[in-house]
Amino acid sequence: MFPMITGFMNYGQQTVRAARYIGQSFMITLSHTNRLPVTIQYPYEKLLTSERFRGRIHFEFDKCIACEVCVRVCPIDLPVVDWKLETYIRKKRLLNYSIDFGICIFCGNCVEYCPTNCLSMTEEYELSTYDRHELNYNQIALGRLPMSAIGDYTIRTIMNSPQTKIKTSMDKPFDSRTITNH
């Protein structure tokens, strides 16, 4: 008889605890209803990347000494380095350097361990194509400097309009058009 009474007490405690958890979750949900949506309309407004963002790799052909450190530290042996040994000067001459960004995991090991700093990570993240073979960049494509996000005209609207400058009338409901089209 006593186990039955303690069972009912445990059931009652569990019911109260479940109701409290449901109430807490509703309070959290309702606290988010007063916030304005933070949405970036991607093709027209671009995301500002952080300083440590790991985007497309930039390659400087003149600095490379064909040491192949980038290939050895890459977890997937991705960079393809073609070189020829110049016997009269006893140095390697770089012929071709390429990286396939369809396979690259953007870990940044090649950039970190390069002894001549000929590799660097850029803030470019728009690498999507319809054909995966277009993601295989040679030394010419890797040497192309990316367009800075700060100088891009589509970024200016985000940088110059903090949340405090947005003016909307209180009778209009808040939606994505109200915030982005000021």
Swiss-Prot record:
[4Fe-4S] cluster 2 binds at residues 74, 104, 107, 110. HAMAP family: NDH1_NuoI. Keywords: 4Fe-4S, Chloroplast, Iron, Iron-sulfur, Membrane, Metal-binding, NAD, NADP, Plastid, Plastoquinone, Quinone, Repeat, Thylakoid, Translocase. Residues 55-84, 95-124 form the 4Fe-4S ferredoxin-type domain. It is an enzyme of class 7 (translocase). This is NAD(P)H-quinone oxidoreductase subunit I, chloroplastic. One of its GO terms (cellular component) is chloroplast thylakoid membrane. It is found in: Plastid, Chloroplast thylakoid membrane. NDH is composed of at least 16 different subunits, 5 of which are encoded in the nucleus. It comes from the Eukaryota. It catalyses: a plastoquinone + NADH + (n+1) H(+)(in) = a plastoquinol + NAD(+) + n H(+)(out); a plastoquinone + NADPH + (n+1) H(+)(in) = a plastoquinol + NADP(+) + n H(+)(out). InterPro entries: 4Fe4S_Fe-S-bd (IPR017896), 4Fe4S_Fe_S_CS (IPR017900), NADH_quinone_OxRdtase_chainI (IPR010226), NDHI (IPR004497). It is a peripheral membrane protein.
